[in-house]
């Protein structure tokens, strides 16, 4: 084979790769309640496709932006999104349909001319977007954009449970804001709507409380970590960190745009050695206390007979109410031995 022939063959192979259409697969997790394949040719998703959202609703506009980002990330196809329905065919319509029962329910209709994702609320539309997103094949070949065929279908779905949550424990191990956002993204991908954020532990205090700076200066840090349960091996590596109130607001907003409610947890009266290390007068013995290196249940807890404890907790809750809009606030309440109270 001559060099010229080899070059032509390589060009032909590249052309065949970049123009080959992939096909969407609606067998996703969680599986929609109803998937009815319909007659008709598939919708071809390509770079001439537009995303249309005619409402000015803020969350719906976020939905349109997310869909464009998801498609670009999965397929390499970059789509524009508009607020007016374009002439002709070849667009994805995001719309609110008040006839759909259930505030998180959605419908997806795919025809040759159009894809329609409808929900009774912006949240429903968002979950429809997640289903469509997961149905797309993931591009290889360095994200070379190639058309994707969406088989004609009618999908109807709604969540079985109103509360679909995941908990992230940042008390025992601190995770950066970027990780927390990635965690929220994974929740959104699986249609979850409640982020239970565990923010205090014997091993660390993770929230900025402006009235009590020692919580960040002392309670947020430990000088080492026991490696494994029932072990005496300490790595002696400092570990810690905390989230500023501005970072918390940023995360709450990030979650809201993805239709996820952030529910904070401050564990009391047990699991409070980090708090006691910062303010030992809140314990029954007066300390000194240290931020815990090891795991398990500790006998040093908040002193329920100390009126100062209730004043401090009220101050903490008052500050957190300024950054967490959720109607729910988790106070733990588990594993609080009464040993010190009885002494």
Positions of the model-derived regions?
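Polar helix-capping/helix-linker motif
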Residues: 11-13, 306, 343
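N-terminal leader/propeptide and maturation segments of large enzyme subunits in energy/redox metabolism
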Residues: 334-343
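Bacterial Sec-dependent N-terminal signal peptides
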Residues: 1-26
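Short acidic (Asp/Glu) and glycine-rich catalytic loops that position anionic groups and cofactors
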Residues: 47, 293-297, 343
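Contiguous, structured surface segment used for ligand recognition
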Residues: 22-161
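A general secondary-structure junction signal
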Residues: 83, 94-96, 199-201, 266-268, ...
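Feature activates predominantly on carbohydrate-active enzymes
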Residues: 101-329
